[in-house]
Amino acid sequence: VLIIAVLFLTACQLTTAETSSRGKQKHRALRSTDKNSRMTKRCTAPGGACYAAYTCCSNACNLNTKKCVLS
């Protein structure tokens, strides 16, 4: 009985996902790209301008010169 319930719930989720994504196929790539860009942290290379250590790829910022340095 448990196996049948799991199969039924899985089938319901698959059909719901299929019907909700109809007509939106061309936008799926855009959503994926937006999600990836939000997850990607951009950092400043050594020698670039910085205001705090977390903006540098090396996590080291010389606050006197306001440039990222190698750590």
Swiss-Prot record:
Expressed by the venom duct. Disulfide bonds join C43-C57, C50-C61, C56-C68. Residues 18-40 form a propeptide. Pfam families: Conotoxin. Residues 1-17 form the signal peptide. It comes from the Eukaryota. Keywords: Cleavage on pair of basic residues, Disulfide bond, Knottin, Secreted, Signal, Toxin. One of its GO terms (cellular component) is extracellular region. Its main location: secreted. GO terms for molecular function: ion channel inhibitor activity; toxin activity. It is found in: Secreted. The presence of a 'disulfide through disulfide knot' structurally defines this protein as a knottin. Belongs to the conotoxin O1 superfamily. This is Conotoxin AbVIG. It comes from Conus abbreviatus.
